Regions:
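The feature marks the mature, well-folded catalytic cores of soluble enzymes
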Residues: 1-292
Length: 292
C-alpha cells in the first residue's frame, strides 16, 4: 500500500486513497426526498430493490477506483448501521484531519461509531467533531486551497451545524460561505462538485444567484447540469485527477459535456444507489489527494 498523506486541500487533484463502505446490509428505506420519491412512485415505475444487483454495481465502482490506481479503504459493515456505506456523510476529510459529523436521520445517527473506529485504527488524525446542530459530510465542498462552501437544507444538515463547521474553517484563514440549498438535493454535493481549480459541475438553475456570483468572483466557470439530471444525482460525481471523472450511467447530457471538455468519463450503472438516495460521490470520502 502506498504511503498516504492524510488530508485534502481540494476535491479534484489525483485521488490516492478513498474511504468506502460495504453495502452488505443495504435496503431501501424512507431516508429523505430522494428515496421517498423512489418508494412513492415504485407502483408506477416498477423499480425494485435487489441486493445482488446493488453489490455488483458497488463492485464495479471499486474496480474503477482500483484500475485508476486508488487505494480503497472500508468502513466496517453493520446490520444496524445499514446505510453507513454512504461514506460521505458520517465524516469528511479536511486539510487538518477528519471531521466527525452529527447526522440527523435516525437510522444513521450512530454512523459516527464506524467512522471513528476507522480513523483511530488507521492512525488518521481527527480534527473536530460537530456538536452544534446536525451536520453531514456531503455539505462540505472543499473547492480549492483556501476556498470552501458549507451547505445545509434543514432536513439533514442544519444551519447551526453548518455555521459551526464554517467558523472552524474560517479560523484557518479560508474564504468560506454557508449556503442554504433546496431539500430536494439533500446535500450541497448534489448541486456542486469542483473538477478543476476553477471549474465546477453544478446545476445553475438550483443554486441561489448570489452563490453563482460568489463563485464567479473567485474565478469559477461552470459545466451546467440540467435540473432533470441533477435531481437524479447527476452532479454527484468523483474527479479522479488527470482529466478522469467517475460519473454514472443516466447522466447522459453531463457525460457528453465532460467528454467534449476532454475528460475520460467512467459511467457505471449505479441505479440501486441513486434510487436509494446517493450517487458515487455520496458513496466515498476522499482521504488523500495530491495537493492542488
Amino acid at each position: 500500500m502506498a504511503e498516504a498523506n492524510w488530508g485534502i486541500d481540494n476535491d479534484y487533484a489525483t485521488l490516492r486513497h478513498v474511504l468506502l463502505g460495504k453495502p452488505e446490509h443495504y435496503r431501501w428505506v424512507d431516508a429523505g426526498p430522494l428515496t421517498k420519491r423512489t418508494l412513492q412512485n415504485a407502483h408506477k415505475t416498477g423499480v425494485k430493490f435487489d441486493l445482488q444487483t446493488a453489490m455488483a454495481q458497488h463492485t464495479e465502482m471499486v474496480r474503477i477506483y482500483e484500475e485508476a490506481g486508488v487505494t480503497c479503504h472500508y468502513l466496517r459493515s453493520d446490520d444496524v448501521l445499514h446505510r453507513n456505506f454512504f461514506a460521505r456523510d458520517s465524516s469528511c476529510m479536511t486539510p487538518w484531519g477528519a471531521l466527525i459529523c452529527h447526522m440527523q436521520l435516525k437510522c444513521r445517527r450512530a454512523d459516527y461509531v464506524t467512522a471513528i473506529e476507522f480513523y483511530q485504527s488507521n492512525n488518521i488524525p481527527i480534527w473536530k467533531m460537530v456538536t452544534a446542530g446536525h451536520f453531514e459530510g456531503g455539505d462540505l465542498v472543499i473547492l480549492k486551497p483556501g476556498h470552501a462552501l458549507v451547505g445545509y437544507c434543514g432536513e439533514r444538515s442544519e444551519q447551526e451545524g453548518s455555521e459551526q463547521v464554517a467558523a472552524w474553517i474560517k479560523e484557518k484563514g479560508w474564504d468560506v460561505e454557508v449556503v442554504p440549498i433546496p431539500a430536494l438535493f439533500v446535500h450541497l454535493d448534489g448541486l456542486l462538485v469542483p473538477i478543476e481549480e476553477n471549474l465546477a459541475v453544478t446545476c445553475l438553475d438550483a443554486l441561489e444567484p448570489w452563490v453563482i456570483d460568489w463563485l464567479t468572483a473567485r474565478g469559477y466557470d461552470f459545466i451546467d447540469v440540467s435540473f432533470k439530471e441533477a435531481k437524479g444525482l447527476g452532479v454527484n460525481l468523483v474527479p479522479l485527477g488527470g482529466k478522469r471523472i467517475l460519473s454514472m450511467k443516466g447522466s447522459d447530457g453531463l457525460n457528453a459535456k465532460l467528454r467534449e471538455h476532454g475528460y475520460e468519463v467512467y459511467d457505471p450503472d449505479m441505479s440501486m444507489f441513486t434510487l436509494g438516495g446517493g450517487g458515487v460521490h455520496c458513496l466515498c470520502q476522499a482521504l488523500d489527494r495530491d495537493p492542488a
